[in-house]
A protein has these predicted regions:
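Long protein-protein interaction modules used by eukaryotic assembly/scaffold proteins
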Residues: 1-199
């Protein structure tokens, strides 16, 4: 196999990993905002369908939303954003969080093997995001208290930089960054710290 064919195959894997990482991240984060306990058994022999060695049971509604709303995933778009918003029974809306997956073309590392190292690093980044999703103010204050009579947390996805105003004293945290010969993927979290609805 020629070097160009190997490079082309590695790039195809890079693109595929970017898409599957992003869709798994959305599934995991949306499920973390449902307020339901998620129990998964450990397995010595992982199922090959468990991308990045993380068992995530897909929600059909989320998969359908991604199919209808998203045409490109990183690296084919520079930024993919997942927003969470609190909707009250009175019709008020409080933007809570924006999760961003970015493709950073300038962050290359020719020594990284896409199939093994990048795949493993994306798995670690996915697990880090899952843990971080349970440490935010939105999770602590609202996720387990949702009810149709008070408020519910909704989400939206789009292929550009975050658009929400998260109020004064919003915070930004870089969850992680992984590099490859074709560029890097990063995950950033922006979140609200003042839980007040503007009137």
């Amino acid at each position: 196999m020629s070097d160009s064919a190997t490079c082309s195959k590695s790039y195809q894997e890079f693109v595929k990993f970017g898409k599957f990482f992003t869709t798994r991240l959305v599934q995991a984060l949306v499920q973390s905002r449902l307020g339901q306990l998620i129990v998964q058994s450990c397995s010595v022999s992982p199922d090959p369908t468990d991308w990045f060695s993380v068992r995530i049971d897909e929600l059909g509604e989320v998969a359908a939303q991604l199919r209808t709303s998203v045409t490109k995933y990183p690296p084919n778009t520079n930024c993919f954003t997942l927003d969470f918003l609190l909707h009250t029974a009175d019709g008020d809306v409080l933007p809570l969080e924006s999760w961003c997956v970015r493709y950073e073309s300038q962050l290359t590392d020719g020594n990284v093997n896409v199939r093994t190292e990048l795949y493993h690093q994306l798995g670690t980044l996915l697990k880090s995001a899952i843990v971080a999703s349970r440490m935010t103010p939105a999770y602590r204050y609202y996720v387990r208290k949702q009810s149709p009579d008070t408020f519910i947390i909704m989400y939206r996805v789009y292929e550009k930089e975050p658009e929400m105003d998260l109020g004064e004293e919003q915070k930004k945290v870089r969850i992680g960054l992984v590099t490859s010969p074709f560029g890097g993927f990063s995950v950033d979290l922006l979140y609200r710290t003042k839980m007040e609805i503007d009137r």
